[in-house]
């Protein structure tokens, strides 16, 4: 039996090609997650598309919890706002 994500996730997953961020967003995400890649959007897309990703929506934002990271995406513009390590 295949594992399907909940319908709430479908909107974000169907629109991964629209995912983008700003120059400042790239810098912020790299700093917050200690990333050593310039393809921050590609990195985020891969994380969001993972079967382990837990995607929730609260108001205007999607929150993706994966590998002790939280990625925040604007639900209307598909802009990656920020990403940070999950606080324990």
Language model region names:
Residues 1-88:
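Ribonuclease/tRNase effector modules and their secretory precursors
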